[in-house]
Amino acid sequence: MVSRRVHTLLEQLRAQGIKDEQVLDALAAVPREKFIDEAFEHKAWDNIALPIGQGQTISQPYMVARMTELLELTPQSRVLEIGTGSGYQTAILAHLVQHVCSVERIKGLQWQARRRLKQLDLHNVSTRHGDGWQGWQARAPFDAIIVTAAPPEIPTALMTQLDEGGILVLPVGEEHQFLKRVRRRGGEFIIDTVEAVRFVPLVKGELA
């Protein structure tokens, strides 16, 4: 039985066009308040982005649901996340697939996310401190790749790490950003523009 606040959020997401009930079930199952600072805990189930420190944010639940839905996941999907951040999106993915690989460039955020995921008994996640622009070649190919920060253009390394039929979902742009979905078919990449968005930039390199 979900709380009234969770139920209200799920109804808002349905009204905004989220149709995948498995995605909505995952959002209901993951306690968002565990991934934010206590000062913002009263806003945990509001449909807004919140700061998590280091100049980063936890995405609004609508955007988490939308991007996850666009990945067209199955339980067997091999998933790569670029930008672990708080670990919230990671936890949603971990509820939907057998294993998630996640790369975070900021060491402190990676450590905090790993701790939160373990506290929630989500052990089907591998995290790595590294440059998200490069993906995770050693674990490729992936059926789905999700990027939670915006590069100015689609990183070539991420497209090449998609398996045949795989889907990459990411925000792209600088001043004006758009959510894109890239699907690999044979030797081609089919790119669709979904909607206008606003994300923090995907910065190259890594931080200790």
UniProtKB/Swiss-Prot annotation:
Pfam families: PCMT
One GO CC term on file: cytoplasm
Domain of life: Bacteria
Keywords: Cytoplasm, Methyltransferase, S-adenosyl-L-methionine, Transferase
Spans through the membrane: none
Principal cellular location given in the protein's record: cytoplasm
Record GO terms (molecular function): protein-L-isoaspartate (D-aspartate) O-methyltransferase activity
Catalytic activity from the UniProt record: [protein]-L-isoaspartate + S-adenosyl-L-methionine = [protein]-L-isoaspartate alpha-methyl ester + S-adenosyl-L-homocysteine
A GO biological-process term: protein repair
Localization terms from the record: Cytoplasm
Enzyme nomenclature, EC number: 2.1.1.77
Enzymatic class: transferase
Active site: 59
PANTHER family on file: PROTEIN-L-ISOASPARTATE O-METHYLTRANSFERASE (PTHR11579), PROTEIN-L-ISOASPARTATE(D-ASPARTATE) O-METHYLTRANSFERASE (PTHR11579:SF0)
NCBIfam families: pimt, PRK00312.1
General function of this protein: Catalyzes the methyl esterification of L-isoaspartyl residues in peptides and proteins that result from spontaneous decomposition of normal L-aspartyl and L-asparaginyl residues. It plays a role in the repair and/or degradation of damaged proteins.
Entry's family note: Belongs to the methyltransferase superfamily. L-isoaspartyl/D-aspartyl protein methyltransferase family.
The protein, known as: Protein-L-isoaspartate O-methyltransferase
